Amino acid sequence: MRTIYEAKDFVRNNFGKTVNVKIHGIRNKNEIIKGIISECYKNIFIVNTNLFKRSFSYKDLLLGIIKIDVK
């Protein structure tokens, strides 16, 4: 993805689908979240898991802070 519009289109096209979100944290700490893309807004989108909701910005996707694998 090269633009914010491509990132938004990717998320919107996978709305309601089960995804794995790999989060690259500080000091090489990685976290993987399995959930469903449940909400899309202007600047953020929300992934629902069984236990909690987690919000991400489209910028995170562009910068490679998170990676989304659609299942």
What role is predicted for each listed range?
Residues M1-N30, N50-K71:
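Short glycine-rich, low-complexity segments
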Residues F45-T49:
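SH3/SH3-like beta-barrel fold
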Residues T18, N43-I44:
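Structural motif
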